[in-house]
Amino acid sequence: MGYVGNALTVSNTADIFRERGQAVPLAELVRKTVRRAVLAYSLYNRRKKTHFILRFLAEQGVRDVLLVGATGDENGENPNLANSGVIEKCIAEHYPVRMGINIEPAITTYPFMIADARALPFADDYVDFALANAIIEHVGQECDQRRMVEEMTRVARTWIITTPNKWFPVESHTSTLFLHWIPAWRKDHEKDFTRLLSRREFRALLPRTAKLSGGLLSPTFTACYVR
């Protein structure tokens, strides 16, 4: 089947396009295009979130910070993770970071330790502010996510937790369209995330006094808490 009169034929070979002089399957070209768009939007969104977080910190008179799920320069050579750590680096430039934690090593300019967000190794009221930017969808199932929120509430006077919206058409971790709405596909990608959240599911994890922003179709939800 094809548009012969326009010299365009749709056939098995129509799945091949050219990118920078090399043959690229259509599916791969689409994936790369979506990925570039996701990365560009991700950088825009992270900068927007950074301004919001810095304004929140100033309003609350924050003295020091705990970064939950901190990343540093270890991903600098990976173009797919080029935007990771943007928010954390900016916060570290403006506020003292008392500690950054992750379950994997990170190269940071501030103190860092391996730790689990579900069992933070800190005393009550350890820090003035804690941030978990797009971390809660990685820590496990509902009970694990709830425990993470409880731990952040225990160790910090104020916190911000952000997470991607499960019902946004683009899945930011894998740069796919709509597939993350299929339970079987999500199960196969548990290495990328464990439990994506809707607004209702996220709200159910939070303290009653926490404020949640982001509409039903927003790409990201942001929760703010002040004790």
How would you describe each model-predicted region?
Residues 130-131:
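Hydrophobic beta-strand segment of the Class I
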Residues 123-126, 154-155:
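Alpha-helix C-terminal capping/helix-to-coil transition sites in glycosyltransferase folds
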Residues 2-124, 218-222:
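Conserved N-terminal segment of class I S-adenosyl-L-methionine
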Residues 139-156, 163:
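A short, conserved alpha-helix within the catalytic core of class I
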Residues 188-209:
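Short alpha-helix
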Residues 135:
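Hydrophobic adenine-recognition pocket in adenosine-nucleotide-binding enzymes
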Residues 209-220:
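Conserved S-adenosyl-L-methionine
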Residues 158-183:
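Conserved class I S-adenosyl-L-methionine
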